[in-house]
Structure formats: structure tokens, C-alpha cells
Curated annotation (Swiss-Prot):
Transmembrane feature ranges: none
GO molecular function: ATP binding; glutaminyl-tRNA synthase (glutamine-hydrolyzing) activity
Subunit: Heterotrimer of A, B and C subunits.
Swiss-Prot/TrEMBL keywords: ATP-binding, Ligase, Nucleotide-binding, Protein biosynthesis
Name of this chain's protein: Glutamyl-tRNA(Gln) amidotransferase subunit A
Family in the record: Belongs to the amidase family. GatA subfamily.
Gene3D superfamilies in alphabetical order: Amidase signature (AS) domain
Keyword Nucleotide-binding: yes
Source organism, top-level taxon: Bacteria
Catalysis: reaction(s): L-glutamyl-tRNA(Gln) + L-glutamine + ATP + H2O = L-glutaminyl-tRNA(Gln) + L-glutamate + ADP + phosphate + H(+)
Organism: Aquifex aeolicus (strain VF5)
BP GO annotations: translation
Amino acid sequence: MLWKKSLSELRELLKRGEVSPKEVVESFYDRYNQTEEKVKAYITPLYGKALKQAESLKERELPLFGIPIAVKDNILVEGEKTTCASKILENFVAPYDATVIERLKKAGALIVGKTNLDEFAMGSSTEYSAFFPTKNPWDLERVPGGSSGGSAASVAVLSAPVSLGSDTGGSIRQPASFCGVIGIKPTYGRVSRYGLVAFASSLDQIGVFGRRTEDVALVLEVISGWDEKDSTSAKVPVPEWSEEVKKEVKGLKIGLPKEFFEYELQPQVKEAFENFIKELEKEGFEIKEVSLPHVKYSIPTYYIIAPSEASSNLARYDGVRYGYRAKEYKDIFEMYARTRDEGFGPEVKRRIMLGTFALSAGYYDAYYLKAQKVRRLITNDFLKAFEEVDVIASPTTPTLPFKFGERLENPIEMYLSDILTVPANLAGLPAISIPIAWKDGLPVGGQLIGKHWDETTLLQISYLWEQKFKHYEKIPLT
């Protein structure tokens, strides 16, 4: 049962030649065949191609030699479809590899599939995929979270040991919480966005899902670092996280923002989080209340900035150069209008309209410009809090995973499921969600937010918690 082994264990076996990359891929392919019909995590499975590629892998010393990885379908993999779960890109084939994919391939990894998401990464439940919803492996009547629901579910059911996602307002951390896995969003600029289909360019960041901290740390190490093709990627040295994670963390101060606890938290989530904090206290962490006075404006700020950037980024899908084109139209203007009307789903249209309004003449200063100023205030609140504490902690989501359809009628309800994750994106801070409990058979995630460029501390606390709680031993659908 190779699919039950962690990435680190697989690495050892592969390095020593005790198993071959082909055998590893076959094992995860078997697991995919057992679970995929129920969960529907993938838009395009690529196990067959990975098996062929596995045969030509020779360099055992590579950091990810023979390791299968699933990839969110808004990240380009050369020669494969990249649909963004949208009708408008249903048949689009990526002409090149995203930088992160290039780095994974160089490290010896094998891409085993493109995973489902909310269309163009806009959503919190993967219900907005134009193709089908992905299901939560812990309860098939509930959502896996979003927008990276497919990536989170694939790691939860172990059809892949690790996966890549993107996080604009919580799209890695929220599904990680709902699916009971680890999900990290690095500092903005830590990982190249070249080849990630843009949603909101000043917020998007690629990150990693996994079941073990060490696994997540290693993959993050491989994909991080400056890239000349992305002007927002930073020339900051990449730590050896795969080694750093095991180092002892002592004497840290953890801040609890009082504003986060003024939101309505589901009792099960509140109880799980309080227990998590008690356990950390026992480990010698000092717990301190901090204040983020402007954080209450995060959701309105985010829902001006993100849709504004999206309306600009999505203007390119007009039926001219690539993607879907309407069949019947009288002139070019009607072609644009029809293509976009038929190609985009309801949530994407909603956000394009919101953004176009916020950027329109006469409203730009009142909305977009003002939101950017509030964003600065939110960032300053975090910087001030980090003068007193090393890490900020909160639940990842205010509720347990919700049922399908429960929030579709009310977009604001859906938006509020990201209320605890959006602030880290606005401030460009690194943040991780780790499984802290199972309540009523459903996973609960705890979020840790770090100082800029300090993913190390987040991973170290995650590793420490994992040693105690051993959440990775729980596997759904077995």
C-alpha cells in the first residue's frame, strides 16, 4: 500500500531503489480508481502519462524523484488542458509550463492530474466549477471548500501525496481545513506566479497541500524563489524548510486577535480551537491577546480589490485568440458579448460586474483607491501586532464544512466563509491551516499567520502539532 506512505518515506524507498517511480504512480492510480467516482477531485487525470514518464526517470538523487503531484487546473502544464473549470477555457491547451511546474519536473516529480476548482478560482466550495462539484471525502454531502477543492480532496483521499493550489483569499487554507489536511499559502512574492492564470494579481499566491508537514515543506522549498519571469517574485533566500521543520520551537508568543473572536464561530469550531490553544500553552508557548482594529473591513476591502483586478485580468477572454468563441454573431461586438455571456458562469460574471463598477469613472476613488488605503491600514495592524508576538492564530474557518447548495442562494454567506483567511492575503503574509480536531466526524482547521518571509515558524509549529496529534493517520473512504 504505497499510497499510504508519506512523501518522505516514499523518497527513501525510491532513493534506495526498493520501489520504482512506476510502482509508486501505480499505487496512487489504484487509489484514484477506488475513490474518484465518489469524490470527483480531478478535471483531467494524467496517471497514464505519468506512468510513461516514470519509466524514463533515472536520477535518484533529485529531491522529488518519482513523487506524484496533483495540480490545480489554473496552473499551466505544457501540452495539457488548463480549463480553470470554465466553459470559456474548456479546450485550452497550455503552450508552456508554469515556473512551479518547471521546477517540480526538474526535481523529478510526476504530474498525475489537474484538479477541480471554482471557476477561475472564484468561490469557497468548488460548486462554481463549470463541470461538476468536488465532494468532501469525509462526508460526500458536504463541500470540500474552495476554490482549490479538488487539490485538497485529492490529498485527503490520497490519490496524490501532495498537491498545488492557489490562494487569493483563502483558497488553499479553507479547503485544507474542510478536508482535514495541511495547506500553506506562502508570503506574497515567495513563489512565482508565472503560468498561474491570474484572478487578482496582487493577492494570488501558489501554495501546497499535504498530510505531513515535512512533505509540504519540501515541495514548497522546490517551488519557491525568485523568477525573472515574474516581476512580483522576490529575491529572498529560500530556507531549507525540509530540515528546518524538525528544529525545536521554544518560547514563542502566539497572538489571538480579539476581533477574530467577535465573529460568530460555530460552537464545535470554537471548542476545537480553544483546545488547540490550551495544548500549545502546555508546550510552553505564551498566549497573548492582540488587536487588529481594521481587520473588520477585510471582506468589503477584498471584494472591491479582488473583483477589480479580476475584471481587468479576465478582459482577455473575448473569443479572439484562444478559448471559447460564440457560434452565432452579427459583428465583432456581438461576438465579444456572446462569447463572454455563454462562456462565463454566474459567480465570475458577478465579480466582473462588481469590479468593473468599482473601477469605473467617478467611482474609482470612492471604491478601489479607498480599498487600497484600508488594505494598508490592515497590513499596518498586523505589523504592529507582530512587534509583540511571533505568530497569530485563529480558526481557519468559522464553521464546519457546509452542505451542497446551502450557500449558493446567498453570495454574502459564501463570501463570509473566508472572513478569517482574507486578511493574510491583503497583508501579503504567510499563513498555514493545520488539522486540529474532528468534530461530528468532520475536520476542523487552525490557522497560523506569520511575519513576512517567516514560513519557517509556521511549519515548525505545524510539525510539533503533527507529532502530538498525528492527524495524518485519519484517512477517509477506507
